[in-house]
Every structure is written in structure tokens, then in C-alpha cells.
Regions:
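Domain-level recognition of nuclease-like catalytic cores that cleave nucleotide substrates
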Residues: 83-135
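Residue-identity detector for glycine
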Residues: 6, 12, 26, 36, ...
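Intrinsic-disorder/low-complexity coil detector
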Residues: 28, 62, 119-121
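Active-site metal-binding core of divalent-cation-utilizing nuclease and nuclease-like domains
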Residues: 29-42
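Acidic-basic catalytic patches of nuclease active cores, encompassing PD-(D/E)XK
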Residues: 1-30
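Catalytic cores of nucleic-acid endonucleases
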Residues: 25, 50-104
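Conserved catalytic cores of phosphodiester-cleaving nucleases, focusing on short active-site segments
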Residues: 22, 41-54
């Protein structure tokens, strides 16, 4: 299997895999990533935010956007699906950890707010830049 490169590829593979799992569980998942929804997938009755990681998340914090945190606190059907070991590219090797209900609520009580920025870096600009210290 070819390893996946980049966050978008890892996230896309994880979301596709979760949607397959949801269908196998008899639910009807819909990808809501580009629809302004607070989570990646609506799979009634569940609202699912997929957190995709190239390797394990053991010992790491899970980032949530403010709107995801608000939805998680408000909606008892909000779930975090943590998909690990995605980078290697073989769905048979992916692992899933599901956080929902009281367990998720207990974790949310300990959440720490952070503030940060993501700076868009278009491919054209990336490709046009010099390598190394010769900037």
C-alpha cells in the first residue's frame, strides 16, 4: 500500500473509511465538511467529527474548533471518531476510537481553550518558493 502524504489525503481517507463503517452499521452517513456544519459527517442520529491521525493519538490532546466544542456540549448525539494509523494508507490497518456520551462529556470538562491561526499556503506559492536558506 502506498503511504498517504498530506493532511487532506489522510483526512479524506479517514472520512471515507468512517462512512463505510457507518453504512455497515445500518446508518445513512452524509459528508457535511463543506456545508458549514459543525462536524464532518451526519449519520442520523449521530453527528460525527472525524479526527484523522497518521499514527497513534495515545498521550496527545484532540483539537476542536469552537463550534465543534459548542455542538459537542449541546448535542448528546455528537461523537468524536478518532481514526489512527491512516498515513500508511491501508484501511485494514486503520484503528477507530469512538468518544461519545458521558465519556466525551467528561473529557470536554477538562478541555483547555487555545487560540491560533492557520495560514493558507496555496500550492502555487509553495511550488514557486526556493528551498533551503536561499530565500
Amino acid at each position: 500500500m502506498t503511504p498517504l502524504v498530506g493532511n487532506k489525503a489522510i483526512e479524506g481517507a479517514a472520512i471515507a473509511w468512517v462512512m463505510e463503517l457507518e453504512r455497515a452499521a445500518g446508518r445513512d452517513p452524509r459528508d457535511t465538511r463543506h456545508k458549514g456544519a459543525p462536524a464532518d459527517i451526519e449519520s442520523p442520529p449521530r453527528v460525527i467529527e472525524v479526527k484523522a491521525f497518521g499514527t497513534t493519538t495515545r498521550g496527545y490532546d484532540l483539537p476542536l474548533e469552537v463550534r465543534q466544542m459548542d455542538e459537542a456540549k449541546r448535542n448528546p448525539n455528537f461523537y468524536l471518531y478518532v481514526v489512527e494509523h491512516v498515513k500508511q494508507g491501508d484501511p485494514d490497518e486503520f484503528t477507530l476510537r469512538v468518544l461519545g456520551g458521558e465519556r466525551l462529556q467528561r473529557l470536554l470538562e477538562r478541555a483547555k481553550e487555545y487560540r491560533g491561526y492557520y495560514v493558507p499556503w496555496p500550492v502555487a506559492d509553495y511550488d514557486a518558493g526556493a528551498l533551503g536558506l536561499d530565500q
